[in-house]
Design a protein with these regions (language model features):
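Short pre-active-site segment immediately N-terminal to the catalytic Zn-binding motif
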Residues: 214-233
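C-terminal edge strands of extracellular/lumenal beta-sandwich accessory domains
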Residues: 401-419, 438-441, 458-459, 466-472, ...
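Non-catalytic, beta-strand-enriched accessory regions in extracellular/secretory proteins
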Residues: 421-450, 464-466, 484-490, 500, ...
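Bacterial Sec-dependent N-terminal signal peptides
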Residues: 23-48
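Zn2+-dependent metallopeptidase catalytic core
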Residues: 100-104, 151, 155-193
Length: 526
């Protein structure tokens, strides 16, 4: 069977009406009457199987396994009159890629056209379009039909024939994503459009209100093309569902896997995307493993990008640096992974509950991993054992949402000794009941100048320092450095005695920072 490619533009508002409209508007010839020039309509049925050529991949990139075909599920199939170009009927393939479409015809030659649109239910559609907003289509060769005929026409969309098989991989990957979301939320996501074409050099990203844009092998990607990068596709799908089902405050921008100082809004957003590709694959491995394109033995938590020189990382087995703190996207992904499975093994349902039902309610503070932590506590009211477990999951990535070794230190009496000069103490700004305050005592000598300073700020910390005199009331110095996250106060002791360094989260912290965080306090003599 010969095939050819078309990119078509059409009104998507008549997907299921064409058959009815054509049957109603084309006049039928009545028996014994003068039919004049009206065409005689006959019925026939076309059945078949639609499949596309996929690519198997693993940690080292594409494996080269061929031929490797998969059913093209839920895609739009049109029966087109060869002579007039009219679409006689439409339907969709099922989960096996099979279709069966009855139609009326008056001329004897038609062809089957497969369009780059998947229709899962009503308005829950997925489209892949070119940057000029045209749908892709693959057509069979023309064939003759006769009244009452049932004709089989299979369509195999193969790379070797120069067909846009990658377009239909994009459709199928996102169809799996839609099914994943429905299993969690009870409904498919709203319509999604992905934009891809050969040579697109504008990057891969999700744009709210528009869709997902994918590299096509040129420009900034250095030849990278993403139509078969399933993990990259699902990463962007994670941004899409965050926009449609949750809340995403990310400012966007450049991000690197080893960057431990990202804007917390960005690290959360990208970490959710990194986690999403693993979560979808994990769900598929349990529910429909035939939809996966990974080679045997590849973990669901392995993220693969087949750009030029393929790279991958396994975020489930990471240990130590450099992937740590709330400001690192991989640390966020691993934390979510170990909540869903692994260490925590709570399943995806509570993760989705916080994502869908709590995060959209957050106001006054940005959505980041702090907000997700707060949501877990709010949605689950965990007992002590669960709280300790999730604290361990977070602290494995040095995300310290728990009491530090110096607590309780919210008051002027602390169990541990006063801090010594030049000694560094690491503190966590965290209190589940409200804003945390660390009060650190030290012994000062009258007439001596000192510098109290915070440094090594992690997890989005932004500190504000006050130094209080021995009467515990008089403030002898304060600093809320509005241009830097760290703070420092220089002062001279007016008398011998115990002075107190009070550290809180800055009230003027930028949106990139957090309410919590980790810092190191040191007092030095000037």
């Amino acid at each position: 069977m010969t095939a050819f490619i078309r990119m078509i533009k059409r009104n998507t508002g008549i997907v299921f009406l064409v058959f009815v409209l054509l049957a109603a508007t084309l006049p039928l010839v009545s028996c014994g009457g003068d039919g004049g020039s009206n065409p005689v309509l006959f019925t026939a049925t076309v059945t078949g199987l639609v499949q596309y050529e996929d690519k198997e991949y693993g940690p080292a990139g594409f494996t080269g396994t061929t031929p490797y075909f998969k059913p093209s599920r839920f895609v739009l199939v049109e029966i087109v009159d060869t002579a007039t170009g009219l679409v006689l009927a439409k339907g969709t393939t099922g989960t096996t890629g099979a279709y069966r479409i009855p139609f009326f015809f008056s001329f004897s030659s038609v062809y089957v056209r497969i369009v780059s649109e998947a229709i899962l239910s009503g308005a829950h559609t997925i489209e892949v379009r070119s940057l000029s907003n045209k749908l892709y289509a693959v057509a069979s060769g023309t064939f003759s039909v006769s009244p009452g005929a049932v004709i089989t026409r299979d369509v195999s969309i193969s790379l070797s024939a120069g067909l846009p098989a990658g377009v239909f991989n994009i459709l199928d990957v996102y169809a799996s994503g839609f099914e994943f979301v429905k299993a969690l939320s009870g409904t498919y996501p709203p319509a999604l459009t992905a934009y891809w074409q050969p040579g697109n050099s504008n990057g891969t990203y999700y744009l709210s209100g528009s869709g997902i844009y994918l590299l096509g092998g040129d420009g900034i990607g250095g030849g990278d093309t993403d139509e078969y990068d399933d993990d990259v596709l699902w990463h962007e799908f994670g941004h899409f569902i965050a926009d449609k089902f949750s809340k995403d405050d990310s400012p966007g921008g450049v991000h690197h896997l080893t960057d431990n100082n990202l804007d917390l809004r960005l690290s959360w957003s990208e970490g959710w995307g990194d986690f999403s590709q693993g979560a979808v694959k994990y769900w598929l491995s349990a529910n429909d493993p035939t939809r996966l394109s990974t080679e045997a033995g590849t973990s669901s938590s392995t993220y693969v990008d087949t750009s030029n020189v393929s790279w991958s990382f396994e975020f489930n087995t990471l240990s130590g640096d450099p992937y740590t703190t709330a400001a690192n996207e991989v640390a966020v992904a691993k934390t979510l992974w170990n909540l869903m499975t692994g260490t925590g093994n709570f399943g995806m349902t509570p993760v989705w509950d916080v994502f869908q039902n709590y995060l959209p309610t957050v106001s006054g503070t940005p959505v980041n991993i702090e907000a997700f932590w707060d949501g877990w506590l709010a949605q689950r009211s965990p007992q002590a054992a669960e709280t300790a477990l999730i604290e361990g999951i977070y602290s494995d990535r040095k995300i310290n949402y728990r009491a530090d070794a110096f607590e309780p230190d919210d008051g002027f009496v602390r169990i541990l000794p006063s801090i010594a000069l030049n000694y560094a103490e690491e503190h966590y700004l965290y209190n589940s009941a409200g804003p945390d305050k660390d009060i650190i005592p030290f012994t000062a000598v009258s007439g001596v100048s000192y510098m109290a300073q915070t440094s090594q700020l992690l997890n989005g910390a932004d500190t504000y320092i006050r130094v209080r005199a021995p009467d515990q009331t008089t403030v002898v110095g304060s600093n809320d450095n509005t241009t830097l996250l760290a703070s420092s106060v220089q002062f001279t002791a007016a008398s011998n005695g115990t002075y107190y360094i009070e550290v809180t989260s800055s009230g003027s912290r930028p949106l990139s920072a957090g309410r919590y965080g980790t810092y190191t306090l040191r007092i030095v003599q000037q």
